[in-house]
From Swiss-Prot:
It comes from Enterobacter sp. (strain 638). This is tRNA U34 carboxymethyltransferase. It catalyses: carboxy-S-adenosyl-L-methionine + 5-hydroxyuridine(34) in tRNA = 5-carboxymethoxyuridine(34) in tRNA + S-adenosyl-L-homocysteine + H(+). The gene is cmoB. One of its GO terms (molecular function) is transferase activity, transferring alkyl or aryl (other than methyl) groups. The keyword tRNA processing applies. Belongs to the class I-like SAM-binding methyltransferase superfamily. CmoB family. The keyword tRNA processing applies. One of its GO terms (biological process) is tRNA wobble uridine modification. Coiled coil: none annotated. Its EC number is 2.5.1.-.
Length: 323
């Protein structure tokens, strides 16, 4: 069973200690009542992985761990098999002792777009909301963060994160909790909060922005990345049943409308840092995700539209400050 005691001990000694008033009971309830039917299969894969300490570790330019001596064919095959038990792998890529996990998303491309616009992460305590497998948390650590805490209710992501952590020498600088943002008290304890690829899944996007603000210290920085459409400050798309085959997409504003939303929620120094169309090179089917991906979600005769006829996915990065 995946344990969270190391995280509890860690925050007991720092400015997150007040979280211990609610967090252990929430996690215990999750372990008791909410485990996915495949959770034991996934957690067994993590348990059977060897705990390895990298001879070389690069989290600044990638997530790459290397051993002093190459793994044997048998060791590499076993590693490959255990990590494939945790498919599908959506967020990465990871290069672990000669095993290259080519994930659906080139999350490194997103990080390269975001990083130049951030305040220096050195020494910061960071919250990553909807963190997926935790890829970006490792990159945050590589960029100098003191502690990265991720939350994501998807239990496969938790197991993927713990698998990677185990192969990175049980690194305790990043932690993933199986929670949603709505389960967090207003901690006001994080120097930087990331919400990337979450807002359009929220039925109440302004409430989500308030929840993110509640987690930041005064003067803290929000990094918001989400789907947007072209248009002025009043433009918002509310898709019908599906958008790019996703059922749970509620609001897709223009970047200018999103800037207004952030200002309405009391953020200051709001700026649109980047806008780019998602390509089928950045999100695609691989041997680590064998189901449909972006190419199948677009109109086969017009790649500027989704299969439903909406504008194809375009994503913006906005940076804002809590005063």
């Amino acid at each position: 069973m995946i344990e969270f005691s190391n995280f509890y001990q860690l925050i007991a000694k720092n400015h997150l200690s007040h979280w211990l008033e609610t967090l252990p009971a929430q996690v215990a309830a999750w372990q008791r009542e909410q485990l996915h039917g495949k959770f034991k299969q996934w957690s067994n894969a993590v348990e059977f992985l060897p705990e390895m300490t990298p001879y070389k570790l690069d989290l600044l330019h990638s997530v790459t761990a290397e051993s002093e001596e190459p793994l044997s064919d048998g060791q590499l095959l076993r590693l490959d098999k255990l990590m494939r038990n945790l498919m599908p792998w959506r967020k990465g890529p990871f290069s672990l002792y000669g095993l290259n996990i080519d994930t659906e998303w080139r999350s490194d491309w997103k990080w390269d777009r975001v990083l130049p616009h951030l305040s220096d992460l050195t020494g910061r305590t960071i919250l990553d909301v909807g963190c997926g497998s935790g890829y970006h948390m490792w990159r945050m650590i590589g960029a100098g963060a003191h502690l990265a805490v991720g939350i994501d209710p998807m239990q496969l992501f938790l197991c993927q994160f713990e698998a990677v952590r185990k192969l990175l020498g049980n690194d305790q600088r990043a932690h993933l909790l199986p929670l949603g943002i709505e389960q967090l008290p207003a901690l006001a304890a994080f120097d930087t909060v990331f919400s990337m690829g979450v807002l359009y899944h929220r039925r109440s996007p302004l409430e989500h922005l308030w929840q993110l603000k509640d987690q930041l210290v005064n003067g803290g920085e929000l990094v918001l990345e989400t789907l947007v459409i072209e248009g002025d400050e009043n433009a918002v798309l509310v898709p019908g049943d599906r958008y790019a085959q996703m059922r749970n997409v509620y609001f897709i504003p223009s970047a200018l409308a999103l800037k207004n939303w952030l200002e309405k929620c009391g953020f200051v120094d709001v700026r649109i840092a980047d806008v780019c169309v998602t390509s089928t090179e950045e999100q695609r089917r691989t041997e680590w995700l064998t189901t449909e991906s972006l190419a199948e979600f677009l109109d086969p005769n017009d790649s500027t539209k989704t299969i439903e006829g909406y504008p194809a996915p375009m994503r913006a990065v906005l940076i804002a400050t809590k005063p």
